[in-house]
Curated annotation (Swiss-Prot):
One of its GO terms (molecular function) is structural constituent of chromatin. This is Integration host factor subunit alpha. The gene is ihfA. Keywords: DNA recombination, DNA-binding, Transcription, Transcription regulation, Translation regulation. Heterodimer of an alpha and a beta chain. The keyword Transcription regulation applies. InterPro entries: Hist_DNA-bd (IPR000119), Histone-like_DNA-bd_CS (IPR020816), IHF-like_DNA-bd_dom_sf (IPR010992), IHF_alpha (IPR005684). One of its GO terms (biological process) is DNA recombination. Belongs to the bacterial histone-like protein family. PROSITE patterns: HISTONE_LIKE. This protein is one of the two subunits of integration host factor, a specific DNA-binding protein that functions in genetic recombination as well as in transcriptional and translational control. One of its GO terms (cellular component) is cytosol. The keyword Transcription regulation applies.
Length: 100
């Protein structure tokens, strides 16, 4: 199963009794605020969930997987997510109950 923005919006509609339009706008607003903060170079800390941070990656040698040719991967800035301890604990607890 994959969680989508539409599914989150539908959940808000059902559980919080928001209108469908309001729940969709709420979800869009939330993700837009996360995007704006990251674009400004700010970390996004969601208590009990985790942190989105920007990380600078240095230039490094690499290999083109299609041709095998050695290439130089340029330095860049990437978004990383670090799960918070509460999220890690809940997922671990759930996984211990579920047998694969």
């Amino acid at each position: 199963m994959v969680v989508t923005k539409a599914a989150i919006s539908e959940n808000l509609f059902e559980k919080l009794k928001l209108t469908k339009r309001d729940s969709k706008e709420f979800v869009e607003f939330f993700f837009e605020e996360v995007r704006k903060s990251l674009e400004k170079g700010e970390d996004v800390k969601l208590s009990g969930f985790g942190n989105f941070q920007l990380k600078n990656k240095k230039e490094r040698p690499g290999r083109n997987p299609r041709t095998g040719e050695n290439i130089l991967i340029t330095q860049r800035r990437v978004v990383i997510f670090k799960a918070g301890q509460k999220l890690k604990n809940r997922v671990e607890h759930y996984l211990m109950k579920v047998k694969y």
